[in-house]
């Protein structure tokens, strides 16, 4: 959620920036009308409160003099009723302003390139050279099925399309990837491993910005019947990413600035309805309703967040480098950024069967957009005032897509897969996966 003070002090500039950079039309007249109404009610409430306090003091003085105070009491009571009505009206207007703010995306950082979609993203760098094959390249589906390790038909039978069953050595390779990522981030990058719930409540999804705007992208549990007195009446939602529960660990907290930055990592399943993705990436593991990801989250002081974004992105890059997977780093343009992001880098891994780079990690600096929703603050020693923290998140990496990249980049002419060296300790020393 953007800072309400920006709308009070720089409404036209903010509206123009949102239009130019985000393609978002802010209803300026509604904002102005609500703000004028809020100001008037704020003044009225404060005036009535002051007058009521003064009258109350007069009652005490009159009572001490032995005077009849019934008229004064009635006056104070009436004023109290008027004050309560003004407070209710003020709360209602503030709620309307808040509701309006919830639909407004974050303002991009100045260095983010203008653009309408992913075709206008800016390539920053490349690492590694795509392998030149001397045989016909197979995609990960053909490779995985031939190795009896990927069973998409079983996924459909058990649930529906966009689900898969992994078996045998490929299931172990998938597990090895997640363990390798966690070990790297905790042992070399300074992250604290967390094990978080996969079901979360409304407040948690609101805090990181999934609700109210992106509810259709989530899987929600059905409201409970209420017939069992032991049931809770609150439905939950499956997490679309570990960013949601992990970032919310600091919700409603005041953090000692000396303890910043906080770095957390978690390996979780992720669940997405993929609303609006009908017909896209229907083959294979690229776009699933359920997939696993190792997430990185950082909570930092505001002045450190841009530096932290470079660091966090570098941590995701290190995974790809150690796996020997060619990739490119892309700075997203304004039209391709997430709703709450101020700046985002995507890492795109080379997939030989598609002869292109595909997203495998997205690393974002959210500034104080999430922190304002979560009331996540920090305070320096000796300071009376708190300030909002900045939050960052990034995939380190999406495990299923990393498996895709390993299968395709490390395939051999006979359909076997060479296990990357860094994964062999997690595979019991296995060097090559065969059928």
Curated annotation (Swiss-Prot):
Localization, UniProt: Cytoplasm
Superkingdom to which the source organism belongs: Bacteria
Gene Ontology terms: cellular component: cytoplasm
Keyword line: Aminoacyl-tRNA synthetase, ATP-binding, Cytoplasm, Ligase, Nucleotide-binding, Protein biosynthesis
InterPro entries assigned: aa-tRNA-synt_IIb, aa-tRNA-synth_II, aa-tRNA-synth_II/BPL/LPL, Ser-tRNA-ligase_type_1, Ser-tRNA-synth_1_N, SerRS_1_N_sf, SerRS_core, tRNA-bd_arm
Pathway the protein takes part in: Aminoacyl-tRNA biosynthesis; selenocysteinyl-tRNA(Sec) biosynthesis; L-seryl-tRNA(Sec) from L-serine and tRNA(Sec): step 1/1
Major location category of this protein: cytoplasm
UniProt-recorded Gene Ontology molecular function terms: ATP binding; serine-tRNA ligase activity
Reactions listed under catalytic activity: tRNA(Ser) + L-serine + ATP = L-seryl-tRNA(Ser) + AMP + diphosphate + H(+); tRNA(Sec) + L-serine + ATP = L-seryl-tRNA(Sec) + AMP + diphosphate + H(+)
Binding of L-serine, residues: 241-243, 295, 395
GO BP of this protein: selenocysteine biosynthetic process; seryl-tRNA aminoacylation
Enzyme Commission number(s): 6.1.1.11
Residue positions binding ATP: 272-274, 359-362
Record-linked Pfam families: Seryl_tRNA_N, tRNA-synt_2b
Domain-related comment: Consists of two distinct domains, a catalytic core and a N-terminal extension that is involved in tRNA binding.
Family membership: Belongs to the class-II aminoacyl-tRNA synthetase family. Type-1 seryl-tRNA synthetase subfamily.
PANTHER family attached to this UniProt entry: SERINE--TRNA LIGASE, SERYL-TRNA SYNTHETASE
Known role: Catalyzes the attachment of serine to tRNA(Ser). Is also able to aminoacylate tRNA(Sec) with serine, to form the misacylated tRNA L-seryl-tRNA(Sec), which will be further converted into selenocysteinyl-tRNA(Sec).
Assembly and binders: Homodimer. The tRNA molecule binds across the dimer.
UniProt name for this protein: Serine--tRNA ligase
Species the sequence originates in: Actinobacillus pleuropneumoniae serotype 3 (strain JL03)
Gene name linked to the record: serS
